[in-house]
């Protein structure tokens, strides 16, 4: 048997190698303790090094966001079921600031404000994580808003145009069609998406805040049926969710939008609606014992919305020329736009579309009040063709509204006023659109130009919308080249105008009104000159009887 020999030098070397790599440091971990948990807020003691907006982990997988950083405790907004927490539970830091996963795979999906899928279609492959609270682009990183974003709604595209990178407020009472306007805008991006051209495509993000789950499901179904879900992401924080989710939902949508914007893409974000976010933030602030201000809102509620909406921008060419267009929705009470939140958001945005319940109830939909609605970008966000035909539209409608109010008290109107009143009535009908039926820009331009030329003047008011629809079908077959020219960005040429007028007259000769009478322009009768009038001389004689 071989003799076992052990070298003392080898043993000494092995011990030296082990001791040189050994570290006597103990792992350090901050652990806090729950003092109380109620109404979605947890008070935690300890955690002296916690960061603002840091994610904290509670037992059972519940997470929270650190908000109030006080000397002896931390106020935490619980994102989950706070009823699972109890006094004495341990709380651990994660070291991560609030962020969500982002990526191309989020298109067509429904997620919560943490980026987790809630549509039952499985996990989503993310490209990276993006912090929710990011600094908005600086002044030097932006460029002016000059590229139109067509909504498909004539009243908006003609009078209050929206450009890529703009923030346009949609404001009005409940049940006035605010969501319908935004959904139509999403549907109108389908044609651009199908081109496959990155410079034309618009990715859409719909942020649902405090809505019923059934309403969100119905919206998703509408987008899917119309073929718009493939380029849309829905961020949902329904009414049943905790206030923390409703507060964070818009920031989650903005983070996802910024990811695509910095890749050079164009994004449309709809916040439906920021009134509910402000109410959720008010509830959180009051529960955190922050001092209340006007209408019990905290002092930084303006900053809440300004730092969110300032993230909408058109980036400079050096940064890829991407854009975020924001359509925030605000709900008013009794058309009161002077309330705290409406005035805040009006001062932040680049214009507003004001929807009025009286117009909505009269069947004028979208119920846009032209006098109050405005776009601070204006004609810069319109094509040349639209700018030319829509130049006087706002003034014509304003004059019609004044004349309409006067006509209710005046019995006799002169011929010019009657003509203006009748044309205004037809113009109002022309601007009415059905829900989920956006109209391409070339169709809008042709309709508005023909209206300005008086093509609708002798069409009965109740037949105007049907006349327009059937006229476009006819022109699509007989003047298709005109549509193609306008879609390519060209203005209406003299030749195109003659083609449209001739085709319209031909269509009128065959159009039947509701009562079955044809619509034909009566030829004007020219007055004869004095020399052309045949004069008859009449001789009157009186017979005198003889006596």
UniProtKB/Swiss-Prot annotation:
It is a peripheral membrane protein. It holds the Pfam family ATP-synt_ab_C. The keyword Cytoplasm does not apply. SUPFAM superfamilies: C-terminal domain of alpha and beta subunits of F1 ATP synthase, N-terminal domain of alpha and beta subunits of F1 ATP synthase, P-loop containing nucleoside triphosphate hydrolases. Gene3D superfamilies: 2.40.30.20, ATP synthase alpha/beta chain, C-terminal domain, P-loop containing nucleotide triphosphate hydrolases. Signal peptide: none annotated. GO terms for cellular component: plasma membrane; proton-transporting ATP synthase complex. InterPro entries: ATP_synth_asu-like_sf (IPR023366), ATP_synth_asu_C (IPR000793), ATP_synth_asu_C_sf (IPR038376), ATP_synth_F1_a_nt-bd_dom (IPR033732), ATP_synth_F1_asu (IPR005294), ATPase_a/bsu_AS (IPR020003), ATPase_F1/V1/A1_a/bsu_N (IPR004100), ATPase_F1/V1/A1_a/bsu_N_sf (IPR036121). One of its GO terms (molecular function) is ATP binding. It is found in: Cell membrane. It comes from the Bacteria. It catalyses: ATP + H2O + 4 H(+)(in) = ADP + phosphate + 5 H(+)(out). ATP binds at residues 172-179. The record marks 373 as: Required for activity. Its EC number is 7.1.2.2. NCBIfam families: atpA, PRK13343.1. F-type ATPases have 2 components, CF(1) - the catalytic core - and CF(0) - the membrane proton channel. CF(1) has five subunits: alpha(3), beta(3), gamma(1), delta(1), epsilon(1). CF(0) has three main subunits: a(1), b(2) and c(9-12). The alpha and beta chains form an alternating ring which encloses part of the gamma chain. CF(1) is attached to CF(0) by a central stalk formed by the gamma and epsilon chains, while a peripheral stalk is formed by the delta and b chains. Belongs to the ATPase alpha/beta chains family. This is ATP synthase subunit alpha.
């Amino acid at each position: 048997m071989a003799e076992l020999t052990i070298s003392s030098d080898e043993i000494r070397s092995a011990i030296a190698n082990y001791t040189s790599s050994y570290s006597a440091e103990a792992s350090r971990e901050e652990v806090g303790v729950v003092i109380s948990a109620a109404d979605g807020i947890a008070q935690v003691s300890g955690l002296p090094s916690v960061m603002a907006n840091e994610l904290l982990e509670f037992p059972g997988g519940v997470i929270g966001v650190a908000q109030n950083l006080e000397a002896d405790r931390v106020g935490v907004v619980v994102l989950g079921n706070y009823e699972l927490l109890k006094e004495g539970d341990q709380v651990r830091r994660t070291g991560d600031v609030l962020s969500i996963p982002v990526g191309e795979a989020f298109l067509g999906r429904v997620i919560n404000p943490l980026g987790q899928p809630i549509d039952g279609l499985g996990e989503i492959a993310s490209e990276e994580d993006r912090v929710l609270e990011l600094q908005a682009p600086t002044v030097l990183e932006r460029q002016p808003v000059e590229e139109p974003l067509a909504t498909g709604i004539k009243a908006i595209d003609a009078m209050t145009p929206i450009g890529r990178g703009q923030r346009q407020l949609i404001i009005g009472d409940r049940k006035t069609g605010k969501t319908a306007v935004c959904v139509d805008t999403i549907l109108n991006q389908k044609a651009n998406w199908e081109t496959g051209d990155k410079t034309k495509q618009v990715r859409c993000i719909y942020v649902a805040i405090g809505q019923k789950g059934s309403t969100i499901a119905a919206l998703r179904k509408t987008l899917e049926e119309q073929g718009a879900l493939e380029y849309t992401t829905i961020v949902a924080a329904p009414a049943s969710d905790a206030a923390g989710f409703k507060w964070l939902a818009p920031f989650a949508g903005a983070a996802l939008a910024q990811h695509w914007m910095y890749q050079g893409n164009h994004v449309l974000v709809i916040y439906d609606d920021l009134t509910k976010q402000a109410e959720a933030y008010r509830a959180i602030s009051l529960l955190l014992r922050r001092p209340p201000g006007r209408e019990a809102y905290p002092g930084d509620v303006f900053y809440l919305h300004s730092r969110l909406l300032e993230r909408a921008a058109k980036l400079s060419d050096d940064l890829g020329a991407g854009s975020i267009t924001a359509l925030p929705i605000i709900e008013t009470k009794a058309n009161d736009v002077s309330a705290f939140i409406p005035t805040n958001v009006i001062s932040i945005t680049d214009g507003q579309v004001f929807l009025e319940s009286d117009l909505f109830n009269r069947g004028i939909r979208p119920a846009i009040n032209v006098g109050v609605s405005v776009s601070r970008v204006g004609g810069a966000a319109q094509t040349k063709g639209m700018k030319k035909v829509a130049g006087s539209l706002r003034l014509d409608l304003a004059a019609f509204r004044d004349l309409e109010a006067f006509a209710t008290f005046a019995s006799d109107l002169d011929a010019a006023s009657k003509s203006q009143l009748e044309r205004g009535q037809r113009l109002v009908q022309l601007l009415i659109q059905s829900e989920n039926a956006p109209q391409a820009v070339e169709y809008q331009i042709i309709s508005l130009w023909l209206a300005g030329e008086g093509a609708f003047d002798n069409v009965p008011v109740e037949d105007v919308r049907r006349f327009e629809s059937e006229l476009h079908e006819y022109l699509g077959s007989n003047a298709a080249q005109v549509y193609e020219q306008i879609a390519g960005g060209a203005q209406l040429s003299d030749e195109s105008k003659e083609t449209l007028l001739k085709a319209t007259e031909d269509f009128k000769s065959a159009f039947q009104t509701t009562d079955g009478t044809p619509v034909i322009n009566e030829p004007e009768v020219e007055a004869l000159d004095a020399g052309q009038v045949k004069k008859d001389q009449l001789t009157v004689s009186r017979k005198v009887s003889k006596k």
